[in-house]
């Protein structure tokens, strides 16, 4: 993992097949973005996709959102780190003991993978939380889980852009805030509800931005990425 890659952009390779993911990755520049591998792609391809992306020079965020008993999650996180991924995540809802077990496993092995936690999925709104027995407002639940994640030694959390400012106040600037659902100006909201533009998200406090279809479905993905880079460079 390169300590010198200076970009907040993570491109989501949301494809069902290895050849599709690699075809897109080959159109991207690993010096200007990282890539994210999610559940469907990893379940269909296994570690081959990580090996191939690393071979192309990319740092990889393995977005599998582990949530299980502490020892099982610790083993899964260790396995991900052994594959050389830059970042991996767990569900903060799994609790303090689960998160601490995962962190301690990485520390014991001296593995440098960033371990972050998922708070509230960006597709979930107030009514969705009530249906699963959470009476708190989404922001209150995010703050509660982010504090727990930080106390448990996580490097950061996944959070929506609207929540980033509150989490910067709650957890500080050094606590990573990885924000999916990012849409450049004039993009549709697709299926993630709590969305802001890249510039708005970074101004709010996000440290990393996950972008999918606005780049991967563009006729020229690097031109689309360059548009986002220009937007980020504009004065806020």
UniProtKB/Swiss-Prot annotation:
A GO cellular-component term linked to this record: cytosol
Annotated keywords: Decarboxylase, Lyase, Pyrimidine biosynthesis
UniProt binding sites for substrate: 14, 36, 63-72, 122, 183, 192, 212-213
SUPFAM superfamilies reported in the protein's UniProt record: Ribulose-phoshate binding barrel
Pathway membership: Pyrimidine metabolism; UMP biosynthesis via de novo pathway; UMP from orotate: step 2/2
Task of the protein: Catalyzes the decarboxylation of orotidine 5'-monophosphate (OMP) to uridine 5'-monophosphate (UMP).
Name this protein carries in UniProt: Orotidine 5'-phosphate decarboxylase
């Amino acid at each position: 993992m390169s300590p010198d890659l200076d970009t907040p952009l993570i491109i989501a390779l949301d494809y069902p097949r290895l050849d599709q993911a690699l075809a897109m990755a080959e159109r991207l520049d690993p010096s200007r973005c990282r890539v994210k591998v999610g559940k469907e792609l990893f379940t269909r391809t296994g570690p081959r996709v990580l090996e191939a992306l690393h071979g192309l020079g990319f740092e990889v965020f393995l977005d599998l959102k582990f949530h299980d008993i502490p020892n099982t999650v610790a083993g899964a996180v260790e396995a991900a780190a052994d594959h050389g991924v830059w970042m991996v995540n767990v569900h903060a809802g799994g609790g303090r003991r689960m998160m601490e077990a995962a962190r301690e496993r990485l520390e014991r092995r001296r593995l440098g993978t960033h371990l972050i936690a998922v708070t509230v999925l960006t597709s979930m709104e107030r009514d969705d939380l009530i249906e699963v027995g959470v009476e708190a407002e989404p922001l209150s639940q995010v703050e509660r889980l982010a504090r727990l994640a930080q106390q448990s030694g996580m490097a950061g959390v996944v959070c929506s852009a609207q929540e980033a400012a509150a989490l910067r106040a709650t957890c500080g600037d050094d606590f990573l805030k990885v924000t999916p659902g990012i849409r450049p100006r004039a993009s549709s909201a697709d299926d993630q509800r709590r969305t802001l533009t890249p510039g708005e998200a970074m101004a709010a406090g996000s440290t990393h931005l996950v972008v999918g279809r606005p780049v991967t479905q563009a006729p020229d993905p690097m031109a689309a990425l360059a548009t986002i880079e220009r937007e980020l460079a504009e004065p806020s």
